[in-house]
A protein has these predicted regions:
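Short aromatic-glycine motifs in intrinsically disordered, low-complexity regions
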Residues: 94-98, 112-120, 147-156, 414, ...
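N-terminal type II signal-anchor transmembrane helix
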Residues: 1-51, 56, 634-648, 652-653
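Small-residue helix/turn framework positions
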Residues: 77-100, 123-143, 162-171, 179-305, ...
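Terminal hydrophobic membrane-targeting helix
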Residues: 23-139, 290-293, 297, 601
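Intrinsically disordered, low-complexity segments enriched in small/polar residues
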Residues: 68, 359-383
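Short boundary motifs at domain starts and secondary-structure transition points
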Residues: 154-156, 379-386
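Short, cationic low-complexity segments
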Residues: 371, 531, 620-636
Length: 654
């Protein structure tokens, strides 16, 4: 028994010695063998692991290594292999077109554990690259060249603990997104002259960005965390970047999860530029031409699972300004079929329509349009309306456009579906009254069809004309209804083909007598009123009934009826040619001294109309006065006296 035990000990000792000798021999072999002779074997093994062609065109060395001093003692001295290879390339799959290679480097210094290889796990503890060039590509079929197998779960798993490089040229091409970006990346310790706002911790690299996104060029700079955070499943990549996307200035900061497990993320996004319309080349969202804007908020993206290709975007708690208008709210961009959907809720304390639709007249003047045209002939672009559907709710406490006249409590809901745009409902308060309306614009045919309907109730005249001191004594109210429809792809074309009508009525009240007397050129009363006080006269009513056909607005009735006079306006307005042709005929109810009351006319283009009395009646009265002056000075005043008439009360007819 004792003899057998000694024999077993000898066998065990010889076995241990043999293993130790084998290990020593293997260690000596690894350390002293010229591994250049084994490059075909090495590259074949690596190619089998990555399922991609691997080439080593320079020297190759294999040696033993241990972990850095930062590792725990329990793992630091476990033997691991270190591979140093020069001129290394990793090939691309046959379908890739962006570049011949996925990656290439002047040298690769890689240390990895041995035992995990038995479990088909490639644990790379340290990877140092010199001048790496990496081209990542996702094709139209959403295949990724950095994915080394088509199997849902690859046979081999790769884990990289530490990554270092001197300078990396990284290109990312995404065919479905129409994205092609290049990142010129260096360690942050060598960074110089990069100015990025907002603090993000753990920034280790800096990069310059260039390329294109859809139809917009991209140019900027950024800083980020360890690139290893983009490679491992549980990685995180802090990021901040600033630059131009097309004409828009973009500031981005936050933390990205690993792309390998990317289901959702959230970043802080700031945008600024000359016009919201400049976002279209990158976003394909047809926003209007506006005044300069700036906005900042939280951008988040989410998808259903790792295989989903559609992302839903949410821009939360954004706030900023467009021109002199403040804006805040939330927006969602949802990928749906047959078109994406934009949903937004926008609030404003002060909104200026000129900021959202800048002066089209000025834009057209720069384009060389005729100076006597005031209606915009700038073409709408309804083709862009097919890019998405939309549901947008806008509320504003105050809307300022005309001097001293403001709208309050504006609210409208914009719907866009299949190139049919509706604004319904549309509500706002004006001049202590209320305006309700509805607008439809149908771009499903070559020439857009538009229809607008507005109803105004109980608008106070003194609030409608706050700049006229003589109007402040008025307590009349305006009620009106307008309905117009037209066809065309510009404001000018829509009005040139307009059909519909406008009806309005001013209720009984008081208006400034000076306005009426000045309209009739009653010189004596006008001077008296200016010197001694602007008296008020009783307004029976004012009535307007305008019929619009084929762009011609005919005044069926336009009458202002007071206790003192009746003012009748007849004629028409040519909306196609932008021409006025109106007669204004005042008729006195009372005796007037020194009256030059005579019919007026308003003729000419919208941009510079001529408003004056007809010279015939005025000259006849002046000539008669001159002739009578030769007979008697008192008689000379007779032609300037208006005897007045017994006129019917127009309001009784309405």
């Amino acid at each position: 028994m004792h003899h057998r035990f000694l024999l077993l000990l000898r066998i065990l000792a010889w076995t241990m010695a043999a293993l130790a000798g084998l290990a020593a021999a293997l260690a000596l072999f690894v350390a002293n063998y010229n591994w250049n002779h084994a490059k075909p074997w090495l590259t074949q093994r690596f190619s089998e692991v990555l399922q991609r062609e691997i080439r080593i065109d320079g020297d190759a060395q294999l040696a033993w290594a241990h972990g850095p001093d930062t590792e725990p003692t329990s793992t630091r001295f476990i033997p691991r292999l270190r591979l140093l290879a020069r001129d290394v390339t990793i090939g691309n799959p046959s379908w890739a077109t962006a570049d011949q290679h996925l990656a290439r480097a002047a040298s690769v210094d890689m240390t990895f554990d041995l035992l995990p290889l038995l479990r088909q796990r490639w644990n790379i503890t340290d990877l140092h690259l010199v001048q790496p060039v990496i081209v990542l590509e996702r094709d139209a079929e959403r295949r990724k060249n950095w994915r080394f197998t088509d199997r849902p779960e690859p046979r081999w798993s790769v884990d990289i603990r530490r990554l270092a490089f001197d300078h990396a040229d990284i290109r990312y091409v995404d065919r479905p997104l129409d994205l092609d970006l290049r990142f010129d990346t260096t360690p942050l310790s060598g960074a110089a002259g990069v100015h990025i706002k907002d603090d993000v911790n753990d920034l280790l690299v800096q990069f310059g960005i260039s390329g294109k996104f859809r139809d917009a060029t991209v140019d900027g700079a950024g800083q980020g965390g360890a690139l290893i955070g983009l490679l491992n499943d549980d990685g995180r990549f802090p990021l901040r970047a600033e630059g131009k996307v097309g004409k828009t200035h973009v500031v981005l900061s936050g933390v990205l999860p690993s792309p390998r497990r990317l289901l959702e993320f959230e970043l802080k996004l700031g945008l600024s530029g000359d016009s919201l319309a400049d976002l279209y080349p990158a976003t394909r969202v047809p926003l209007p031409a506006t005044a300069p804007f700036q906005v900042s908020g939280q951008l988040s993206g989410a998808r259903a699972d790792l295989t989903a290709t559609q992302w839903d975007w949410h821009y939360r708690k954004f706030a900023g300004s467009i021109g002199h208008s403040d804006i805040r709210g939330e927006a969602q961009y949802l990928q749906r079929e047959p078109r994406p959907i934009l949903r937004a809720t926008i609030q404003s304390d002060k909104l200026m329509p000129g900021d959202l639709v800048p002066s089209l007249g000025q834009q057209e003047k720069r384009r060389g349009s005729k100076p006597d045209r005031t209606l915009s002939s700038r073409q709408f672009d309804p083709e862009k309306w097919d890019a998405m559907d939309a549901d947008i709710t806008v509320t504003a406490q105050r809307v300022e456009q005309l001097p001293k006249i403001a709208l309050q409590d504006l609210r409208f809901v914009l719907h866009l579906k299949d190139r049919l745009l509706t604004i319904d409902p549309l509500h706002f308060a004006l001049a202590e009254g209320r305006v309700d309306g509805r607008v439809t614009m149908d771009a499903r045919q070559k020439q857009m069809r538009a229809q607008a309907e507005l109803e105004a109730q109980a608008l106070r005249l003194r609030k409608l004309f706050p700049s006229l001191a003589s109007m402040q004594g008025s307590f009349g109210q305006l009620d009106a209804h307008a309905r117009l429809a037209g066809t065309g792809n510009s404001i000018a074309a829509l009005l040139a083909s307009a059909e519909g009508g406008v009806k309005a009525r001013v209720s009984e009240g008081a208006v400034s007598k000076f306005i009426l007397e000045a309209a009739g050129l009653n010189v004596a009363d006008a001077v008296f009123a200016k010197l001694y006080r602007d008296r008020q006269v009783h307004l029976n009513c004012a009535v307007a009934d305008i019929d619009v056909k084929a762009g011609q607005a005919h005044f069926k009735q336009f009458v202002v009826d007071t206790d003192d006079a009746v003012i009748d306006v007849t004629g028409h307005i040519d909306l196609a040619q932008e021409q006025l042709d109106l007669d204004i005929r005042p008729q006195s109810r009372e005796l007037r001294v020194f009256t030059l009351r005579t019919p007026l006319y308003a003729k000419g283009p919208f941009s510079k109309p001529e408003i004056a009395p007809y010279k015939g009646p005025l000259l006849a009265r002046a000539g008669a006065a001159a002739a009578l002056a030769l007979v008697a000075p008192v008689a000379a005043a007779l032609p300037l006296i208006s005897m007045g008439k017994e006129l019917p009360n127009v309001c009784a007819q309405h």
